[in-house]
Amino acid sequence: MKPSAVNQILQQTQHFFARFDVHLPPFAHFSPAVWQQLDRQPWQEVFDLKLGWDVTAFGDDDFARKGLTLFTLRNGSPGGKPYAKGYAEKIMHCREAQVTPMHFHWRKREDIINRGGGNLIVELHNADTRDGLAETAVTVTLDGCRQTHAAGSRLRLAPGESICLTPAIYHSFWGEEGFGDVLVGEVSTVNDDDNDNRFLQPLSRFSQIEEDQPPQWLLCHEYLRFIA
């Protein structure tokens, strides 16, 4: 992805968040120049835990078809050291018909919450013993109600609804066509993008950046490229 595209995507997402009165911490708005002027040491938790902006096309070249924009608000270390939080939180902009590809987590348990906008479609499968798709029924909890669905079921989450996904449940999600973009929340155990994502089809979790203009905001995996 090019910084020009990322800049535009983040501008759109900030406007989308503002529609729902979503407020982010001050560092969400720091420019690269501001980051470069700061003492790095007090901000080490942000860098180590990849807090902040994330724009990904999952290695694809069509962000509108496959991609996600999110901001990680809080996180902890796998194993609890050096950062003892046992939980994580994200706020996400899931665009209409924009797919987050099928994946599961070995360790993370998460609630995916439709905070507003359109409907969120979530497709579900269990993982089999070889990390492929199982044909077994999938058991999940929707807002405290335990439900079992056939493999490959697509559940529709309207604004206010949520789903709890346990480890080893494959899931893919997107904004339902005809209903607009979706404001999605995620509350989970510790998030470890480097070691706890299993995508059904191998892909890049973070997009490679091809320089064409300066970034207006830094992505969570780019801080150390810009900060001495």
UniProtKB/Swiss-Prot annotation:
<dbReference type="InterPro" id="IPR010864">
    <property type="entry name" value="D-lyxose_isomer"/>
</dbReference>
<comment type="function">
    <text>Sugar isomerase that catalyzes the reversible isomerization of D-lyxose to D-xylulose, and D-mannose to D-fructose. Shows optimum activity using D-lyxose as substrate, but can also effectively catalyze the isomerization between D-fructose and D-mannose. Shows lower activity with L-gulose, D-talose and L-ribose.</text>
</comment>
<keyword id="KW-0479">Metal-binding</keyword>
<dbReference type="InterPro" id="IPR014710">
    <property type="entry name" value="RmlC-like_jellyroll"/>
</dbReference>
<dbReference type="InterPro" id="IPR047581">
    <property type="entry name" value="EcSI_cupin"/>
</dbReference>
<keyword id="KW-0413">Isomerase</keyword>
<comment type="subunit">
    <text>Homodimer.</text>
</comment>
<comment type="similarity">
    <text>Belongs to the D-lyxose ketol-isomerase family.</text>
</comment>
<feature type="binding site">
    <location>
        <position position="103"/>
    </location>
    <ligand>
        <name>Mn(2+)</name>
    </ligand>
</feature>
<dbReference type="GO" id="GO:0047828">
    <property type="term" value="F:D-lyxose ketol-isomerase activity"/>
</dbReference>
<keyword id="KW-0464">Manganese</keyword>
<dbReference type="GO" id="GO:0050089">
    <property type="term" value="F:mannose isomerase activity"/>
</dbReference>
<feature type="binding site">
    <location>
        <position position="110"/>
    </location>
    <ligand>
        <name>Mn(2+)</name>
    </ligand>
</feature>
<feature type="binding site">
    <location>
        <position position="105"/>
    </location>
    <ligand>
        <name>Mn(2+)</name>
    </ligand>
</feature>
<dbReference type="Pfam" id="PF07385">
    <property type="entry name" value="Lyx_isomer"/>
</dbReference>
<dbReference type="GO" id="GO:0046872">
    <property type="term" value="F:metal ion binding"/>
</dbReference>
<feature type="binding site">
    <location>
        <position position="171"/>
    </location>
    <ligand>
        <name>Mn(2+)</name>
    </ligand>
</feature>
<keyword id="KW-0119">Carbohydrate metabolism</keyword>
<protein>
    <recommendedName>
        <fullName>D-lyxose/D-mannose isomerase</fullName>
        <ecNumber>5.3.1.15</ecNumber>
        <ecNumber>5.3.1.7</ecNumber>
    </recommendedName>
</protein>
